[in-house]
Every structure is written in C-alpha cells, then in structure tokens.
C-alpha cells in the first residue's frame, strides 16, 4: 500500500468512526428536540441541507475504506461486488424484464434471482470461453437490445476477465467499422433483435477487419441451454481475471459517445468508476437491496449501464429492463416490475406528460425519478401528475471522472443538478469548480493577467471542471478514449489555478446560485453569438415553451448561419400538440408568443420552423447538430416553410422576396 493510500485509509477510518459517534449522540437529541423545535430544524435543513450530508458522508467514508482494502486485496472489480450480492441476497430478484408480446401493449414478466443469474452467467462463461475462445484481456463487443441476455453476456465477460464494449445497435457502415477498429475488438456477440445493421455492414467489416469474428446468437436455443442445470459451468481463476498488473483505473468496459468528426469515440469506464463510484451514486439516490430500478434507456449508454445497472446491482437490488422506451406503455411496465426508481433522460419526461391519462400512472411504487435533462418548466408538473416524491437530477458525462447529483423534494432546488449540504459542498470545492469564460468567446476559458483561471461568480455561467489529482498521470482520474489520444488530451486543461495543476473539461456551462446549488445551462456548442452577444439556447427554449405551454409540445433553439452576417442567428424548431394547424394559425401562435417573451432583441429567434417530430438520438436526446445546418430560405430540398421576425416586431412567412432583400442587405437582421 502506497503512503497516500495509507493516509487515506487511516483518515477514512477516523472520520467514519467520528461521524458514527456524532450521529449516535445527535440522533436521539435531534428527535427529542424535533418535537419542540421542528420548524426550526426544518428551516436549518433548508438552509444547510445537513440531513442529506449525514446520510451520505458515513457511507462514503465506509465505501472509501472498503475500496482501499479491495484494491490492496486485488478485488476491486465489479465481479466481486456481484459475488458479494449473490452470497448476501441470493434469493432477491436481480433482473426483471417486460418482454413484449405479439399483442401490442402486452408483456410477459421474466425474473431472475441473484443465484439464478450467477448460475446462468457461469454456464454462459463456459460457452464463451470454450466454444468461442474468449480470453482474459480481450475486448469483446456486445450488440444487443435491452434484455436479460445483455446483462448475462456482460457479467460473463467480466467473469472471464474480458472487457465488454457496448455497441449502439443502430450503428452501421463506416461508424460501426470505426467503433470496432479503435477498440481492438476481437469478436462481436449479436442479439437477433439487433442483427440487421451488422448484417448490412458485414462485407465492409470483413474487408476492413478480417480477424474480427461476428457471432450471431440464437437467443431461444441459447437460453434453453443456460437454464439447464446440467449445462457445464466455468468460473475464471482470480489471478487470471485480476492479474497483478491490473489497476483500478484500467477499463472495465467501453461505451461509445458521439465524436466531433461524426465518428464514435470509445470512452473508457474505469473499474473505480463502475464499482465504488456507482455504489456511492446508488446510495445518494437511496437505493437498497429492496429497491428496483426501472430503465427504458438503452444499456449501451452510461445512464442505464453505469447509473442504472451497476448502481442497483452493487446494492443487491433489482434491475428492471424495458425492451425499448414506449410512452404509451411506460407506466404499465413500471407497475408490472414494482419499480421504486425510474430513469429518465432528455425529453422522456415531456413525452410522458403528453400521453393520455393511464390507470397505471399512479398505481406504481415509484419514489425516485432520476436522470438528466428534466427541464424546470415541467419539473413540478411531472412530479405532481405521476405522484413522484423525489427528483434525482444529475449532471454527468460518459467519460467524466465524477457526477453531481440532487435529491430534490418540495419546492426548493427545482432545476438544480447539484444540491448538497454545507459539508459536502466544502469537500467538493476541492474536486469540482465553475470557471469564468472569455466575455468575447464563451468557448474559451478566461485567464487573468497572471495567466490563471478564475472561479465564476454566483449567477455567472462558467464551464465545469473536475480535478485530476495526479497531473503527471492524468489517466488515474480521467481515462479518456481508447485509441484516441488527441481527443483525450483535448479534454484536459492545465495551469488552471496554479502551475502544474490539471483539470478535466466538461465542455458544458453551468451556474451557481447563492445557496450553492448548480444549474445546467448549455452545452458549450449550444450557446451562440449574435450581434456580438452570447445567447443561451436553454434560456430561449424555456421562455418560448412557457409562452404557450398548451400548444408547444416541444421546442428546440439553435444558432444558424446567415450569409453575409457574423455569428449565428436564433432558429427555433417547434413541434405542436396539433399538427393540423394551417399557416395563418401558426403565424398567430408565434405572434401571441412574441408578446410574452422577455428576451433582448439579439436573443429573439429570428427564424422559426414547425415540424411533425423533432429528431432525436437513440437515447432520446435532441439532435441539435442536424438543425444547426438548416439552409435558408427553404431548406436543402426547397420545401421548408420558414417564418421570420420581420423588423423584430412580427413573425411572417419568409418569402422569396424577403430573402432576396435580406441577402442584398436592404433589409437588416
């Protein structure tokens, strides 16, 4: 054990014992005084949020202590966490799955306990190791939809000592070949429900990567063999699964994210992140071995894989899987699985609010809805309609070293993605910060006359940075992307507050309020400049949505290029609740909204387009990049109807004559 580990180990034990002692003394006193001074303690908690701190800190210290021991014993991998839960919670459900039936809207509930899952995984490990020659250290791709088979493959690869890479099952062609190549994939295991893109790309894969094996699984036959108690099993030797040279910042899995070139990047999920990181995250969101986390998010993304599966399975609870997201059957599946927690991302909550009332939407057991991307304008509406007690909005990036969280109840902290008590805030101040941006270019971090960055003042947008604790070995905190050193290096900024320090750049703008809460504002690429001013797309979207909540089902704002003008002009894309409205009705809607907008002229959307559907990613996030490429005046195919804000006073249809005048600059924007 290194000197630093010894110090951390000792301090964690001391602080843990100290907190236990204080908690032992304070708890009965607090209960007694609570009867007399209940309102005072409530106000104190509202101001300092000490209750959640008392809940989080002892567990965090205990986890750090146990993790250091596990690292010392070379037992830091998630496989050993899984074994622990098999031993302690063998009869508890580990996985449930609402398998879609032929009849639309009907499901067959499949369940597997921890001991059943363990036995299946050992049988599948035998097949993978002896029939397919999967070896420890191999990078093996899983191309699978949401179903128990995905988790069985995942755990089997961990048992063998291989590293799973989660392919987006919609990827095909060049991006698919690129994904396999940069990750040194040896073979791919393919779910029959996800096989079409691979089959379409098979010739391209074989030409570019002839050594990569494509294994098309027959799920029904395979599951029959895995459920047979007479099938042979394989448990890898510990010293092969976890060789002495393996460190806890090495890859536990690979998850693909979108790249700036249009090709995916393979983000490294370290063992530290997927094990102790997800354990602590689960505790912060009050997961226990009695909890069930329902996710309709794809397992090939980190939200479902790390913050769903890894988090709940490390606590001995149940992972409930939906085959894919369906707004119309969401609450029925939640009810069938008995979920206590549900995951959301992007616009999922808005989709659910726009569904007809279902008898299942209040028959569930859900206490916590957690995810990222819940907008403040529907935060309380979502909670009230679906009877959700707690919102767990978090901020994280797939490749980021840490996440921020909130456990929000009541009216305080709506919209925040980081909300802790005074003690944890102080601790996190050494780990996370918001830095000021250049007033002339909000994609550039501001540096003062000494060449250092400055913390963003309260209320001012700043880029979130996360500390890299060993600047000379940044991979111990931030592992980056496999096979892409350039992109990895671009995410690290140095000499931030002193010479030699290093921080991970999140690439997002957040702001802090006077209570220490943090709020997500924009992706760095989403903010645009017009008339030499920075425009927050989130602010404009929120105001535009609020101006007509009944008619505007979904609103997107981006900046688009206008020939002969510097910067980008505001462009709003609107999906209506009623798509049958004609141009006259749409014009009236826009001008009614205009009177309710409280935006400076430079932030007003100069151009507007109505669409039947806003294009989304596979993980239900808006594809803003597509809309940033909007061509004026009629789109690429010449069929778009675009509205424009004439003289900043009234919306009208953009005609050919209007565009000629704008292009000739006889009309100024």
UniProtKB/Swiss-Prot annotation:
GO biological process entries: long-chain fatty acid import into cell; long-chain fatty acid metabolic process; protein quality control for misfolded or incompletely synthesized proteins; very long-chain fatty acid metabolic process
Recorded catalytic reaction(s): these are:
a very long-chain fatty acid + ATP + CoA = a very long-chain fatty acyl-CoA + AMP + diphosphate; tetracosanoate + ATP + CoA = tetracosanoyl-CoA + AMP + diphosphate
* Alphabetic keyword roster: ATP-binding, Cell membrane, Ligase, Lipid droplet, Lipid transport, Membrane, Nucleotide-binding, Peroxisome, Transmembrane, Transmembrane helix, Transport
Name one matching Pfam family. Answer: AMP-binding
Coordinates of motif C-terminal peroxisome targeting signal (PTS1) in the sequence?
667-669
Q: Which residues lie on this side of the membrane: Cytoplasmic?
A: 1-5, 170-270, 340-669
Predominant location of this chain? other
Membrane topology note: Multi-pass membrane protein
Q: Which residues lie within the membrane without crossing it?
A: 271-339
Mark the transmembrane ranges. Answer: 6-26, 149-169
Q: Which domain of life is it from?
A: Eukaryota
Entry-linked SUPFAM superfamilies: Acetyl-CoA synthetase-like
Renumbered to this chain, motif FACS spans 501-551
Annotated positions binding ATP: 256-267
Q: What does this protein do?
A: Acyl-CoA synthetase required for both the import of long chain fatty acids (LCFAs) (C14-C18) and the activation very long chain fatty acids (VLCFAs) (C20-C26) by esterification of the fatty acids into metabolically active CoA-thioesters for subsequent degradation or incorporation into phospholipids. The transport and fatty acyl-CoA synthetase activities are genetically separable and are thus independent activities. Esterifies VLCFAs in the peroxisome matrix. The VLCFAs are actively transported into peroxisomes by a PXA1-PXA2 heterodimeric transporter in the peroxisomal membrane.
Misc note: Present with 16900 molecules/cell in log phase SD medium.
Q: What is this protein called?
A: Very long-chain fatty acid transport protein
| Organism from which the protein derives | Saccharomyces cerevisiae (strain ATCC 204508 / S288c)
């Amino acid at each position: 054990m290194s000197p630093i580990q010894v110090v951390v180990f000792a301090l964690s034990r001391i602080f843990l014992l100290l907190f236990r002692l204080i908690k032992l003394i304070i708890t009965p006193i607090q209960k007694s005084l609570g009867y007399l001074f209940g309102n005072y303690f409530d106000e104190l908690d509202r101001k300092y949020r000490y209750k959640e701190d008392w809940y989080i800190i002892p567990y965090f210290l205990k986890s750090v202590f146990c993790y250091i021991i596990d690292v010392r014993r070379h037992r830091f991998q998630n496989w050993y966490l899984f074994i622990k839960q098999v031993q302690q919670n063998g009869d508890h459900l580990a996985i449930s799955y609402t398998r879609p039936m032929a009849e639309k809207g009907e499901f067959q509930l499949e369940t597997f306990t921890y001991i059943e899952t363990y036995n299946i995984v050992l049988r599948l490990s035998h097949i993978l190791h002896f029939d397919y020659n999967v070896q420890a250290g191999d990078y093996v791709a899983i191309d699978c939809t949401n179903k128990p088979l995905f988790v069985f493959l995942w755990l089997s690869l961990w048992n063998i000592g291989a590293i799973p890479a989660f392919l987006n099952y919609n990827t095909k062609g060049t991006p698919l070949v690129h994904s396999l190549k940069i990750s040194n994939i040896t073979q791919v295991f393919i779910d029959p429900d996800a096989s079409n893109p691979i089959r379409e790309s098979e010739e391209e894969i074989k030409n570019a990567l002839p050594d990569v094996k494509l294994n098309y699984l027959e799920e029904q036959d395979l599951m029959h063999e895995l459920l047979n108690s007479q099938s042979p099993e394989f448990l890898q030797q510990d010293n092969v699964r976890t060789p002495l040279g393996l460190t806890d910042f090495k890859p536990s899995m690979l998850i693909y994210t979108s790249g700036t070139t249009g090709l995916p990047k393979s983000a490294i999920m370290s063992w530290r992140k997927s094990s102790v990181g997800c354990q602590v995250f689960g505790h912060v969101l009050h997961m226990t071995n009695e909890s069930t986390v329902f996710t309709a998010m794809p397992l090939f993304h980190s939200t479902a894989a790390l913050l769903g599966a890894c988090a709940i399975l490390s606590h001995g609870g149940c992972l409930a899987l939906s085959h894919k997201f369906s707004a119309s059957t969401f609450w029925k599946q939640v009810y069938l699985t008995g979920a206590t927690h549900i995951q959301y991302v992007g616009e999922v909550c808005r989709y659910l609010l726009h569904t007809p009332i279902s008898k299942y939407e209040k028959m569930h057991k859900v206490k916590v809805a957690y995810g990222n991307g819940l907008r403040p304008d529907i935060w309380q509406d979502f909670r009230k309609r679906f009877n959700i007690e707690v919102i767990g909005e978090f901020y994280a990036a797939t490749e980021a070293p840490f996440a921020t969280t909130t456990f929000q109840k009541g009216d305080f902290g709506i919209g925040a993605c980081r909300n802790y008590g005074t003690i944890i805030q102080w601790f996190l101040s050494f780990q996370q910060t918001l830095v000021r941006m250049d007033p002339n270019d909000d994609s550039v971090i501001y540096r003062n006359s000494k060449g250092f960055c400055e913390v963003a003042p309260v209320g001012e947008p700043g880029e979130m940075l996360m500390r890299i604790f060993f600047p000379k070995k940044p991979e111990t905190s931030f592992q980056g992307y496999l096979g892409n050193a350039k992109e990895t290096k671009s995410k690290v900024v140095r000499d931030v507050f002193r010479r030699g320090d290093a921080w991970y750049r999140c690439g997002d703008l957040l702001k802090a309020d006077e209570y220490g809460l943090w709020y997500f504002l924009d992706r760095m690429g989403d903010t645009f400049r017009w008339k030499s001013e920075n425009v927050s797309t989130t602010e404009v979207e929120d105001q535009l949505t609020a101006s007509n909540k009944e008619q505007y089902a979904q609103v997107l704002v981006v900046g688009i290029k206008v020939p002969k003008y510097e910067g980008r002009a505001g462009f709003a894309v609107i999906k209506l609740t009623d798509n049958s409205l004609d141009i006259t009705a749409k014009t009236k809607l826009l001008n009614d909204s205009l009177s309710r907008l409280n935006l400076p002229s430079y932030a007003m959307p100069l151009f507007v387009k109505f669409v039947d559907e806003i294009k989304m990613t596979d993980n239900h996030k808006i594809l803003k990049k597509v809309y940033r490429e909007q061509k004026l005046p009629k789109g690429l195919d010449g069929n778009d109807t675009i509205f424009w804000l004439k003289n900043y006073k009234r919306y009208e249809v953009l005609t050919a004559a209007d565009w000629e005048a704008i292009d000739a600059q006889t009309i100024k924007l």
